[in-house]
Amino acid sequence: MAIQQQPMTEPVGIPVIILKEGTQRSYGREALRANIMAVRAIAQILKTTYGPKGMDKMLVDSLGDITITNNGATILDKMDVAHPAAKMLVQISKGQEDEAGDGTKTTVIFAGELLKEAEKLLDINIHPTIIVEGYKEALRKASEVIESIAEPVSYDDVEKLKLIAKTSLNSKAVAEARDYFAELAVEAVRTVAERRGDRWYVDLNNIQIVKKHGGSLRDTRLVRGIVLDKEVVHPDMPRRVENARIALLDTPLEIEKPEIDLEISITSPEQIKALYEKQERILQEKIEKIAATGANVVITQKGIDDVAQHFLAKKGILAVRRVKRSDIEKIARATGARIVTDIEDLRPEDLGYAELVEERKVGEDKMVFIEGAKNPKSVTILLRGGFERLVDEAERSLHDALSVVADAIMDGKIVAGGGAVEAEVAKVLYEYASKLPGKTQLAVEAFARAVEALPQALAHNAGHDPIEVLVKLRSAHEKPENKWYGVDLDTGEIVDMWSRGVLEPMRVKLNALKAATEVASLILRIDDVIAARKEEEEKEEKRGGEEE
């Protein structure tokens, strides 16, 4: 129940008002159920997008811009969520996206199912603390099961890595080009992967995705270097430079205006001419300084004015201006250049190296390609597509594919998809629960039912009877050798998903279960919600009082 004020009565019977007027408070079972309802509502929205046969959502923002996607992270990001419990779910789901790169929908749907099962236990008067403890115990056991059945994968298992990427891409808008995109994703990740001790490390920041609509998805290609969505600044500059020695600048090549206001008294045309000549000399000296280091390519984060462009062109130097800071840093990492903030400090050893810097036409636009860099651990995927929204969705899909391949290489453990892991985990949890004392047993069983809801959602979204599929799954997993049996979403039959090549990183599964259990436990521990009056309402009331 929601009330405006909650008086507290001392033993002598004097009411004490502790909350500011206008503050709303809900507490007890009603507060808990309201929070559960909010999380389940978000989960229900994402549930129909789950799996390769899931539907898409059309999201329209306040400006009327339309996004069509089934990417869980994007849907949550675009939704204007108001309820505090729902906001918690969104925040934890974003953490899943940051940590594993995929599995956002699994996290949200599983959290919703955990709270749905918890609500049933609350109805039979099981305390929230017991439910939370039971869920923690079930999560510990589930994690053990997943880690014990996971199979090894290595940097050299290229075919398995491609299957992992294809599994991620199956549910995306780019599914028709999944084979091609899977190859690109694996090649890109393997290129930037670094061996550190006995483990592999992948920094996805070394993989740049540049979007350019036009052409088809299959026109997308991998560039072993950096691509700048810029063009060479002057028509007389070279368009192709081999054995490029690159100067990276964080300073403008133009006459800067003084920070204080100055007035110059000019009495003759000769003085104007002298002023312009002085400015030219300053710029010419800067260009001479750059050329003296041996640089034949200049890339700056700031501007290059017309006079500086002219002098650079005369020296045969290719120049690009107003490049994003993030791109400048990528070029620095790739070429070994040092970013210079003052041309007076520029030295030959500050220059980066690349085999080729070239301006090329891509669709209707020109772009600058930097290839054969000193450090090959930087690559660019030039993403093409027939229209802008398709390219945007392809970028989101490709990001997920890159993430799961990186997870697999770094962790070296993978599992089968199609609900196989969930069915195996649920089977073990039911057996484990029967050995537990007291009400904890009921909470562990509830966790198992929530896990089983995931393959049921896959089946439902593919048009199959979820109950029938669940019964078949349970029957198949009675045999230990059938641990990788899951749902064939085309036929509804239970098949060996490992032999079908439906593979996922262990990290995605583990992190999704952990994140969902964490948010469900947080929600179940809340028994009081105190909402301060909104600032806008207070201002409105003050204005109304002043008018009176």
From Swiss-Prot:
CDD domains: cpn60
One Pfam family hit: Cpn60_TCP1
Gene Ontology MF terms in the entry: ATP binding; ATP hydrolysis activity; ATP-dependent protein folding chaperone; unfolded protein binding
Keyword annotations from UniProtKB, A to Z: ATP-binding, Chaperone, Nucleotide-binding
Keyword Cytoplasm: no
The organism's place on the tree of life at top rank: Archaea
Keyword check for ATP-binding: yes
Family: Belongs to the TCP-1 chaperonin family.
Quaternary structure note: Forms a Heterooligomeric complex of two stacked eight-membered rings.
Function recorded in the entry: Molecular chaperone; binds unfolded polypeptides in vitro, and has a weak ATPase activity.
The protein's name: Thermosome subunit beta
Source organism of the structure: Aeropyrum pernix (strain ATCC 700893 / DSM 11879 / JCM 9820 / NBRC 100138 / K1)
Taxonomic lineage from the root: Archaea, Thermoproteota, Thermoprotei, Desulfurococcales, Desulfurococcaceae
Gene: thsB
